[in-house]
Design a protein with these regions (language model features):
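A structural signal for multi-pass alpha-helical bundles of membrane permease subunits
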Residues: 11-303
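Short, Lys/Arg-rich, polar N-terminal cytosolic tail immediately upstream
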Residues: 1-6
Length: 303
């Protein structure tokens, strides 16, 4: 009996060993290496960088550009999930529950799901280049062209420091919302139609249907969406780097932590300082995910 238990344990361990080793080598090991490099002055060329302790972090917290990047990431952390989830829930509810009968959704809802999902099949760099043309400050811009034709002054969507951040946020929402429309639509499709029909018989309007039935039953999905979008807001890089002037400009008005990591590592060759930025970003991301899951925890509703 004891021998059989030992063989079973050995069998299970042999299967678990390979994925655990791969995880340690390719996931945990790079994190440990980044933490070590963050405490050195490595510039990418020396084999043995000098250990400088927490000097990179002291310098980091005194860097005004770093605090601008953190401010923009925190603004995205609040606004991107909030706007995206509100819009995605609205469109998903409209496609699945908001039809003439109040239950079946609007006509052609499958086609609209494909249209909403289309931005997800585009590479992020392609989206950034497309919106560079949309936001052009001259008459060839898709937005400024009609404004100038009507005699209005062109808007510096990417050249005005007061507008550029909101332009970046708009592009991020445009790219993300379609996926969550499809995600929430799948969740709504799993809710029995009988619930909506019974609520309508009891006199519930669409406002009550949404807040008393739809949202409570979709809460787990909304919670996961909020975490994913929050991580996206903290990790955003390509849209800012490709689309904006000076890769985070003008005047650092759109820069984010990921852009500063790339700039310091591959333009200034300050890999130690860039790694310190990465460590701070890592703790921001993990802290947000843990806090979100704990704050939004609630009793599961089954149906």
């Amino acid at each position: 009996m004891l021998f059989n238990r030992y063989r079973r344990g050995l069998f299970i361990t042999s299967f678990l060993a390979a994925p655990v080793i791969l995880y340690l080598v390719y996931v945990i090991s790079p994190y440990v290496q980044a933490f070590y490099i963050a405490m050195t002055d490595w510039r990418g060329v020396t084999a043995t960088p000098a250990f400088i302790g927490l000097d990179n972090f002291v310098r980091l917290f005194g860097d005004s550009i770093f605090w601008k990047a953190v401010t923009h990431n925190l603004a995205l952390l609040v606004l991107l999930p909030l706007i995206t989830i509100v819009l995605a829930l609205f469109f998903a509810f409209l496609l699945n529950v908001g039809g003439p009968q109040g239950v079946g959704g609007i006509r052609g809802s499958r086609f609209y799901r494909v249209v909403f999902f289309f931005p997800q099949v585009l590479a992020v760099a392609v989206v950034a280049v497309l919106f560079q043309q949309v936001f052009r400050p001259d008459g060839s811009g898709m937005l400024n062209g009609p404004l100038m034709a009507l005699g209005a002054r062109p808007v510096g969507f990417l050249s005005d420091p007061g507008v550029a951040f909101w332009s970046v946020l708009g592009v991020l929402v445009w790219q993300a919302v379609g996926f969550y429309v499809v995600l929430f639509s799948a969740g709504l499709a799993s809710i029995p139609r009988d619930m909506f029909e019974a609520a309508q018989i009891d006199g519930a309007g669409r406002f009550s249907l949404f807040f008393r039935i739809t949202l409570p039953l979709l809460w787990d999905t909304v919670q996961v969406a909020w975490v994913y979008l929050g991580i996206l807001a903290l990790d955003v890089f390509a849209i800012v780097w490709v689309m904006t002037d000076q890769h985070g400009g003008p005047d650092w008005s759109t820069t984010v932590m990921a852009a500063e990591i790339y700039r310091n590592a591959f333009q200034y060759f300050r890999f130690g300082y860039a790694s310190a930025l990465g460590v701070v970003m890592f703790f921001f991301t993990v802290g947000f995910a843990v806090l979100s899951l704990r704050v939004s925890r609630r009793e599961r509703i089954e149906y």
